[in-house]
């Protein structure tokens, strides 16, 4: 089959607010961001069931997508560990439309992210960094009892050895889970 050219452009409107906080002498920093956006595309995702398979494509027709997101970050220096702790968190709610088997189906996707980190100089010659990245998302189609859920977890640990002023060696380990 052959596609057709789309001469229309995407449109997007967005409003965003940001709030920052810092106490430099206490090594405390924070940030909060809130965003709402609305976009319109000249095509709509299209899904058709054929012989037990779900065929995905696009069809001509405007599709509106509304998205709300909020994110926050916090960091704090801690002298007794000679380092910093960080915490990043985010939430997003996105709503749009798709066409499945010639029926318009509203859908919503919600995503949560949490990312704690630790960076510390255990000794003058040894630096440790640890990061955990956790994400959870749900895709729900209106009028369907089940929703698609996805969980992912990623951990990373790095150790940097610096036995001499101009020599360093780093060991990195990662673990993934989906």
Model-derived features: positions:
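Exposed, low-structure sequence patches enriched in small/polar residues
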Residues: 1-178
């Amino acid at each position: 089959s052959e596609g057709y050219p789309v001469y229309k452009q995407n449109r997007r409107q967005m409003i965003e607010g940001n709030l920052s906080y810092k106490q430099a002498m206490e090594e405390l920093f924070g940030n909060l961001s809130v965003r709402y956006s609305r976009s319109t595309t000249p095509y709509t995702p299209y899904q058709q069931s054929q012989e037990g398979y779900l065929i995905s494509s696009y069809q001509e027709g405007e599709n509106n997508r509304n998205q709300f997101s909020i994110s926050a970050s916090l960091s704090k220096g801690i002298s007794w560990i000679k380092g910093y702790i960080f915490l990043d968190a985010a939430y997003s709610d996105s709503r749009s439309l798709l066409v499945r088997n010639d029926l318009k189906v509203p859908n919503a996707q919600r995503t949560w992210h949490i990312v704690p980190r630790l960076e510390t100089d255990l000794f003058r010659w040894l630096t440790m960094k640890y990061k955990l990245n956790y994400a959870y998302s749900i895709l729900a189609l209106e009028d369907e009892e089940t929703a698609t859920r996805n969980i992912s977890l990623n951990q990373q640990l790095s150790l940097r050895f610096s036995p001499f002023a101009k020599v360093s060696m780093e060991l990195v380990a990662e673990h993934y889970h989906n």
